[in-house]
C-alpha cells in the first residue's frame, strides 16, 4: 500500500493529528463549536487588521484622519474597518460563551488548558484595549487616560509606572505609537498561546456533556466535526455580517466620531460593551487601589475555579442546584454589564455594589457549598 503523506510528512502529520484523525467524543454539542469560531475570529482580525495597518498612521495629528481616509478613499476600506471593529465584538461573544461552556461542563478540570485559556482572555482584553485607542477619537483618548491612570494605584511605583506606560506626562504621541506597536504584536502572541492551548487540550482529549471518559467510544474529527464547525461558522457569520453591514456603529460610542481633545472631557467615559462588567466592578469600590484589585480579581478569579470544584460529578448536566446558580451568575454578569454603561448616580451605584458582591459570592462561596450539598444529597 502506498504511504499516506498526510500521516508521514512531519508538518502534515501535526495538522492531521489536530484536525483530521483527532479522536473526538461522539456526543459533544454545539457548545463545543466556539473553539473553532474563536480561531476563525482570530484569522479574520489578523487579516483585516493587516489591511488596516497598511493605511493607518500612528501619529496624534494624523491617526483620526487616516482612519477617515481608509473609510472614504480606500477600496472597500469602510468594509475592512467595520469587519475589524465588529469582529472584536464577536471575538468576545465567542470567548464568553466558550468560558461559560467550560464552567458549566467542568472543562476547567483540565488545569493547563484552562490556565492557558485565562492567559488568552487577558491577552485578548489587552489587545482590544490598545486597539480601541488607535482611531484617536474622544473615547479612545479618554479611555486610554482613565485606564492607564489605574496603574498609579500601585503603591510606591505607581506614578513611575504610569509615566513609563505613557512615555511622557500625559497620553500623547509616544503613547499612541507604542499602543500601535502592541496592537500589531499581541494578536500573533494570541496565535502562539492558542497553539499551546490546543497542545494541552490534545494531551487529554475533549471533555463531553456527560463529563465521563469517552476513550472507548471516539470518532474521527473529520468529517463529523469539520462539517459541524463549518455549519457553526456560517451561523456565526450571518449575525456578524448583518451587524457589520447594516448597523456597523451600533456597538460603538458616538463620542469617537469627534477627534481626541485633551481639553474636553466626555460627559460619560465608558469602555466598549465587553469590558462593562469589569468596569462596573472597578467603579463599585470607592477606593482607587481597592477598585483596581477588584477589577483584576474579576478576571483572575477564573484561575481559582478548578480548586473550588467540590462536586463528585464533573459537569452540571445532572446538578439542578448548580445549574440554577450558574444561570444566576449569567444574569448577574448581564446586570453588571448594564450598570457599567450607566452614570455614577443613585440607584446605579448600589445596584452595581450588590451585583459585584454577589458575583464574587457566587463564585467563591456558593458554588463550592452547593457542590458539597449535592454530594450529601446523593449519599441519601
From Swiss-Prot:
GO process annotations (BP): mitochondrial electron transport, ubiquinol to cytochrome c
Major place of residence: mitochondrion
Cofactors that this protein relies on: heme b
GO annotation, cellular component aspect: mitochondrial inner membrane; respiratory chain complex III
Protein residues bound to a ubiquinone: 202
S-S bridge residues: none
Residue ranges of the TM segments: 34-54, 78-99, 114-134, 179-199, 227-247, 289-309, 321-341, 348-368
Membrane topology summary: Multi-pass membrane protein
Subunit structure of this chain's protein: The cytochrome bc1 complex contains 11 subunits: 3 respiratory subunits (MT-CYB, CYC1 and UQCRFS1), 2 core proteins (UQCRC1 and UQCRC2) and 6 low-molecular weight proteins (UQCRH/QCR6, UQCRB/QCR7, UQCRQ/QCR8, UQCR10/QCR9, UQCR11/QCR10 and a cleavage product of UQCRFS1). This cytochrome bc1 complex then forms a dimer.
Described purpose of this protein according to its UniProt entry: Component of the ubiquinol-cytochrome c reductase complex (complex III or cytochrome b-c1 complex) that is part of the mitochondrial respiratory chain. The b-c1 complex mediates electron transfer from ubiquinol to cytochrome c. Contributes to the generation of a proton gradient across the mitochondrial membrane that is then used for ATP synthesis.
Stated name of the protein: Cytochrome b
Organism, scientific name: Coturnix japonica (Japanese quail)
Underlying gene: MT-CYB
